[in-house]
Amino acid sequence: MKFIIIFVIIIFNANTVSAAEFLIYLESAYKSNPFLNASRENYKAIKENINISRSEFLPTVFITGSQSSQQNSNRTNKVGTTLPDNSNNSEKKSISVDQKIFQGFQGYNLIKKSKLETDQATLELKNTEQQVLLQSATAYYDLVYKIKNVQFNLLNVDLFERQVESDSSRLQKGEITLTDLAQSESSLAGANAKFIAAKTELLTAKSNFERIIRLPAPEKIIKDNSIKTISLNLPTGLNSAFIFSEKNNPKLLLAKLDYKISEKNVDIEKSKFSPSASINYTQSQNKDFSSSVDEADQETLKATVTIPLFKGGKNYSSLKKKKFRKAQSNLILQDIINEVKTDTANSWSVYKSSSSILKATQAQVKAAEIANEGITLEYDSGNTRTTLEVIQSRSLLLNARISNAKAERDFAVSKFKLLAVVGKLTLENLKKS
């Protein structure tokens, strides 16, 4: 029994993961996750909309040039007289400058909309970063839990193997019956089945870890100190969580920007009812080597004013459509405000309850270890303890350890979920802590 206790102590103090190593895993996902990198490229693309909108205020310059050559042969006049061959050669060069003067503030509103869309892309990137970091932390702590699950089940198999050996010897001495040995053998078979299932779950957890974090999954993480050594700067109370989420929750901020963009879309549609003005300057040079005028230069300055009168009702319908979209965005915003409040309350509740559950499972493990050690010693000393009582105590100990490992996993993940819902789950914040 002393050997087993020493073995457990050695296992649970090996392969300790520090906060620095944990951050390495998160940083790998932050840099290498394909979904996050795709969001970064989307941000770069959306950012170019500002330059595209600004181009509406700048002149457009065209340079054109053409050259033609025409050869005429086998010519005759009306009476059939043959005419000499001739050729026509011409060149034309021109430069044209177009400048929009007024578009009913359409260009101004397009720039404003582009800036809002860039802010929106920034928030979408932040939201994606939070999702990837949360997925990475969840994958990591899930891997820790599944590795512990395998180790606990392996230790359980080892204990039952020793019990079967001990019971076989005691059966030969007549201390127990064949039924007692059969109970031990059945428990060993059940322990092996659970061990195989735990290994299968571990393979799935490793695969998920490598998919999200983009690094090989560690083979052993028995003791994890990351959640204890990282200060996540969580809200101190539910009211504090509400304040943070209202200011920083990306989902809520995105909904607010969606509404502002819908307002700009209405303004852009309204500008299409306004008159527009533009000016054009063209300078051209023509050369015709076959005509009486060899060369001619021409300059043209043209001002154009366009007043929209009727377009088959298209403008009115487009404006109505944008107004309906604006109303839709406002309704969605109100719903998301309530949704974020609910998510914040739920995340806070899960965080507090998981903390209580963790403390309860720690007490459960401590009590189960004491009970199992006492029952096993009494059984080995030939006391009145039965084989079934030993099996039950070991099953209770295994379940207590697995429940505690799961509670540790749930508590750690609940912290990151709460940090995400208040909009503070960033790699920079984690490194500062």
What are these regions (language model features)?
Residues 24, 131-244, 347-350, 354:
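Periplasmic alpha-helical coiled-coil/stalk elements that build and connect Gram-negative outer-membrane
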